[in-house]
Amino acid sequence: MRSTSFRFSFRIARLLLACAAGVACTQASAATCGTSPENGTPQWRPALHYTPQRNWMNDPNGLVYDNGRYHLFYQYNPVGNDWGNMSWGHATSTDLVHWREHPVAMRANATEEIFSGSIVADTRNTSGLGSPGQAPLVALYTSVYKDGSGHAPGTQAQSLAYSVDHGATWQPYAHNPVLTLDPESKQFRDPKVSWYAPGHYWLMTTVVADAHVVKLYRSDDLIHWSFLSDFTLPDVPHAGALWEMPDLVPLPLDGDVRHIKWVMIVNVNPWSIAGGSGAMYFVGDFDGRTFTPDRVAPAGSDPARFRWLDHGADFYAAGTFSGTPGTRPVAIAWMSNWDYAAKVPTTPWRGATTLPRELALKTIDGEPRLVVTPAAAFDAWADGRPAVHEGELAVESATRELSAATRGVVQRITVTIAPQRAARAGLIVRRSADGKTGTRIVYDTAKRTLTLDRSQSGEANFAGTFSREHIVDLPLEHGQLRLEIVVDRGSVEVFANGGRVALTDLVFPPLDADRVAVFAEHGRATFSGLTVTQLEAGGDTRSVCAAR
């Protein structure tokens, strides 16, 4: 891999650091971060979710905590609002809530595009790439080669870059790629690296996407890799789909650190639970060489027989941060779906991340399952915002709009619903004054299902594949359903029964659809602890372009 694009990024970074607030600095910043004034579709620009100021983004990459900051790199097109010219964008946060956009970290060039990968802090300097007193950040990413690269066009291999200034600038390793297949492959990608403490080595998961194989490797120095094993399914039920972005994560079962299970996250496209792309997972054991799942759905099973991190349509390319200070892994995903991502009606940007989420493993119905909740930092921040407490409401065969004080387009709603004798009960968010527009969260007592229904949520005809309803089985707990709902200008995220179920959907409502209502159908339901917290007043958490 040639380093011309990296050196260009270095020159831009040095210019940004050196320049004062003048024309040269403004132009350099705009070229790398896109800080032109907002235009296009600001009514759908996220306030709570990271999105670049302009242009296309997809997979989160290089998720790492270093020197007091969370780093979010991501697949980025620096020159357009469609997929292409794959490079690594870059943003940072100190709290997982407020994000700052930085110049492009690694840029596509004439012979190579920079596909997905991961970053670790090489605190022991096992790679030998650090400088005195400064351990390096090491990125492993997929090089996709073009004509003139010395590889067949389209070949994918794993390459390395490193930083000795906490991620501000990146230097390509002189002998890239560091890992290839023999024969070379056009589907070998997405390295995720972590430290495997029991074996004192680095562990990498990658995929051969079209073969539905996760390949595991080990290394002592992040440069030289040896094969460990393959993980696949004996009867892959989704022929034609791709496996992408694997991540192997250890978690204590029910909080017992003496009982560690391993979770293999595999993002699949298409064939997800909600249609199109999604993130499934397997729980099992890892012995230092081989991952063995506890259960695999029988041959011929449909998606409902598999486990999913999220049952909505817009949760893909999920991965976890490396080196986080807390005890629970923190994951984040791309908030879109390959079924319609290229047609999402936003401009001058297209693509956003989900809320960061904490992962835990709990025994549910006799099996270990992931529990997914908003990151504690988000909830702590939201807890400090002004809230309206509606108290307890009883609704019988009716829809009741909440008080005017609950109106807003960026908010967190918490409530416990007791459906009682109602056939269906729930909430409507981003509801219009005439009631014709709104996103419905519906519990069906007979079917024991929770539905996120965006069929009347606003603009929905931009793509025929923009699915309307997303349904998940969910029994009540002691006759109740606990919900945490996070509403942004262009999305709704639902966390039910303490994270047992999550649903994430994009929505595109008119700006004046700012009301909240509760409803019960064919009977009585009660809504207790109903609290609406406004999260927009006082400034956005969304990205601002910044010099390093």
Predicted regions and their residues:
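N-terminal signal peptide c-region/cleavage motif recognized by signal peptidases
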Residues: C25-S29
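Bacterial N-terminal signal peptides
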Residues: A13-A24
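Short beta-strand/loop turn elements enriched in aromatics
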Residues: S5, R14, T32-C33, K447-Q456
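Beta-rich accessory regions
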Residues: G255-V257, D285-R305, L309-R548
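Beta-rich carbohydrate-recognition and catalytic domains
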Residues: A31-D190, W195-W243, P252-D310, G326, ...
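Catalytic nucleophile-His microenvironment captured as a short glycine-rich beta-strand/loop
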Residues: V249
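N-terminal secretory signal peptides that target proteins for export/translocation
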Residues: M1-F10
